Amino acid sequence: MSRFIDAAEQLLGGPVIPECPEGVLYFAEAGWHTDDGTGVHGVKFAAYFDDLTAANGALRLVPGSHHPEQHARLAAYERRQRPVRIDADPAAYQASIPGYVAATSPGDVIAFDLHTWHASFGGQDRLAWTAVYQRCPETAAERDRTLRSVHDSFEQGFRGFDRDRYPVWRDWLGGAAAHPRRAPVIERMRHAGVLDLPGARDGW
């Protein structure tokens, strides 16, 4: 965890707070999208448990698409391309936006800005572990966006989740004293109001 915190702080240029990490089974394909819906400044780390290439579902990313001006151009372009749907003509949809194929082997970790456009094509079932870190909010507006984003992640992550069969990491908060790197992160979460959100204690 501390390695990811250090990397996130270096990439985002300041202190960070985490969202709940997730273990995810991806299947089929995912069209071009970003992972930010509220305007937060964050980075996502993804580790896949299979060897992935362009042929079997490796993550594809559009370099530079996290910059606002490039994001706006891509969004406008995608709207013009809407008649080309992934289910109607997969090859045409895949070719409609060029992307870098991040081929990976187990043990590799991909880090990308939440605003980066990414997709996956030709996918098989693939298991991944992901963790998101946000830049610690400094203004009331940033705090509001952070809380909405984290709340959304709780809703998606724990709605209908069988916590008895698949326990969450309930000792992360309680065991902070034994991990000096963790304590200041928890204090940032508490100060930002993250730990007051519904579901926060279940998630951590």
Regions found by a protein language model. Name each.
Residues 1-61, 66:
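Conserved double-stranded beta-helix
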Residues 31-37, 103, 119-123:
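Short histidine-centered beta-strand/loop micro-motifs
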Residues 40-46, 56, 99-101, 117, ...:
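Extracellular structured ligand-interaction cores
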Residues 42, 72, 122-124:
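Hydrophobic alpha-helical membrane-insertion segments
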Residues 45, 49-54, 71-77, 188, ...:
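Short N-terminal helix-initiation segments at or just after the protein's N-terminus
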Residues 51-58, 78-88, 95-97, 143-154, ...:
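Low-complexity, flexible helical/coil segments
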Residues 55-118:
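Double-stranded beta-helix
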Residues 115-204:
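Non-heme Fe(II)/2-oxoglutarate
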